Amino acid sequence: MIRQRTLKNTIRATGVGLHTGEKVYVMLRPAPVDTGVVFRRMDLEPPVEIKASPDNVGDTRLSTTLVNGEVRVSTVEHLLSAIAGLGIDNLYVEVSAAEVPIMDGSAGPFVFLIQSAGIVEQEAPKKFIRIKRAVEVREDDKWARFEPFDGFKVGFSIDFQHPIFSNGVQTAELDFSTTSFVKEVSRARTFGFMRDIEMLRERQLALGGSLDNAIVLDDFRILNEDGLRYEDEFVKHKILDAIGDLYLLGHSLVGAFTGFKSGHALNNRLIRTLIAQEDAWECITFEDENESAPISYAQPVTAF
């Protein structure tokens, strides 16, 4: 049987909020079976809980933001990507502000935190969402699609007219039965253009953004002295984002996702469209010892 997973211990970290530029504390706590991923705003009295789910997604302009009434937690996608990549089902995420700290702009620090806390299996079968037929959403020339696949596969294409992209388009496809999320995806950082960052700062946004937590480009080159962590780091970060956005479904996917110039808004529209079409998916478990589960989920990933 493939079992649900949570953390072995509670662990805490400190970082900077991408948009406020202020110090943010985050604490990851184990949670009981069937809890899912629940964010808690501990700076409020009483603390307010927001479950990671498609219906609780509010603003998707610059990051994925979860809302409960007037209360919000933004920039959740990198942490959710790490949680998904390590197969964690149940977790409390306590934060001291309205955003998750940006850390180094990737999911790597969150992977390290989760692995440091330890991962334990729980006495309940892990639930999966299996894609039964293709579902697609489009907006202008952008699109995102789910298709049936025996495992978990993510493909993505980005298109930027910039000198560092030889033909504008960068594409990657990763089958997680043969690819390690931790090694190949988790360290890919968010990226932005200097001109956009300056415009955001005028609107009191991206105040915590720096070369320490993003790849920054001017009109000609990458400004980070250390260069890239992966040759295709830009598109791999979009895959990282997508994995986090898709985990708002609440369960790991058995299926394939493909995105072309998709972002948080379109990713969220796709998962809402999927949920609404009940013949397009099913919730499954792998409880029979003789049943062959998709190889991507056979063992927890516990090391870099």
UniProtKB/Swiss-Prot annotation:
EC nos: 3.5.1.108
Recorded metabolic or biological pathway in which this protein acts: Glycolipid biosynthesis; lipid IV(A) biosynthesis; lipid IV(A) from (3R)-3-hydroxytetradecanoyl-[acyl-carrier-protein] and UDP-N-acetyl-alpha-D-glucosamine: step 2/6
Reactions it catalyzes: a UDP-3-O-[(3R)-3-hydroxyacyl]-N-acetyl-alpha-D-glucosamine + H2O = a UDP-3-O-[(3R)-3-hydroxyacyl]-alpha-D-glucosamine + acetate
InterPro entries to which the protein is assigned, alphabetical: Ribosomal_Su5_D2-typ_SF (IPR020568), UDP-acyl_GlcNac_deAcase (IPR004463), UDP-acyl_GlcNac_deAcase_C (IPR011334), UDP-acyl_N-AcGlcN_deAcase_N (IPR015870)
Active site residues of this protein: 264 (proton donor)
GO terms for cellular component: membrane
Biological processes, Gene Ontology terms: lipid A biosynthetic process
Residues annotated for Zn(2+) binding in this entry: 78, 237, 241
Keywords recorded for this protein, A-Z: Hydrolase, Lipid A biosynthesis, Lipid biosynthesis, Lipid metabolism, Metal-binding, Zinc
GO molecular function: metal ion binding; UDP-3-O-acyl-N-acetylglucosamine deacetylase activity
Cofactor(s), names only, from the UniProt record: Zn(2+)
Taxonomic superkingdom: Bacteria
NCBIfam families: lpxC
PANTHER family in the cross-refs: UDP-3-O-ACYL-N-ACETYLGLUCOSAMINE DEACETYLASE 1, MITOCHONDRIAL-RELATED
Family per record: Belongs to the LpxC family.
Function per UniProt: Catalyzes the hydrolysis of UDP-3-O-myristoyl-N-acetylglucosamine to form UDP-3-O-myristoylglucosamine and acetate, the committed step in lipid A biosynthesis.
Name recorded for this polypeptide: UDP-3-O-acyl-N-acetylglucosamine deacetylase
